[in-house]
A protein has these predicted regions:
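Bacterial Sec-dependent signal peptides at the C-terminal "C-region" and cleavage site
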Residues: 3-23
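Conserved, structured core segments of small domains
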Residues: 18-127
Length: 127
C-alpha cells in the first residue's frame, strides 16, 4: 500500500502540474505624430521644446526593442511599436514628454501587416 501511496504522491507533485502559461505574442500599433498646440512655428523642429526628451524617449523604446520601425512622411511622424495591447501602446505614447506638453499630438492605431516578413511583431534577433 505504501508504494501505491508514494506513486500517487509523486503523480500529484510532478505529473499534474499545470504548464506555465506562455505570454501572448506582442502586437503592432502605429503611432502617428503631428504638431500640437505647443508647437512653435517660429522655430525649426530641432529647436522645439521637449524635442530632446522626445528623442530620448524614442531611444529608450528602441533599446527595449519596442519599436518595429519609425520615420517621417510629410508633416507627420510614424512609429510602429510592439505592445501587448492598445493600452500598453497608449502608455508608451503618453510617456513621451513632447506629447504630454502638447508639442506633438498623436494617435494610436492597431497595425496590420499585409506583407509578412517585412515587419514583425516579434523582437529582432540579438546582434
Amino acid at each position: 500500500m505504501k508504494p501505491v501511496a508514494a506513486a500517487l504522491l509523486l503523480l500529484v507533485a510532478f505529473g499534474w502540474q499545470q504548464p506555465e502559461p506562455t505570454p501572448a505574442p506582442p502586437k503592432l500599433f502605429a503611432i502617428v505624430f503631428r504638431t500640437g498646440p505647443a508647437w512653435d512655428t517660429a522655430r525649426p523642429p530641432g529647436q522645439q521644446s521637449f524635442m530632446k526628451e522626445h528623442s530620448q524617449n524614442l531611444g529608450a523604446l528602441r533599446k527595449a526593442e519596442k519599436i518595429a520601425l519609425g520615420g517621417r512622411f510629410g508633416e507627420f511622424g510614424l512609429v510602429v511599436v510592439r505592445a501587448a495591447d492598445l493600452a500598453e501602446a497608449r502608455a508608451m505614447l503618453l510617456a513621451d514628454p513632447a506629447v504630454a506638453q502638447g508639442v506633438f499630438q498623436a494617435d494610436v492605431h492597431p497595425w496590420s501587416t499585409i506583407y509578412e516578413g517585412c515587419t514583425s511583431a516579434s523582437a529582432p534577433p540579438p546582434r
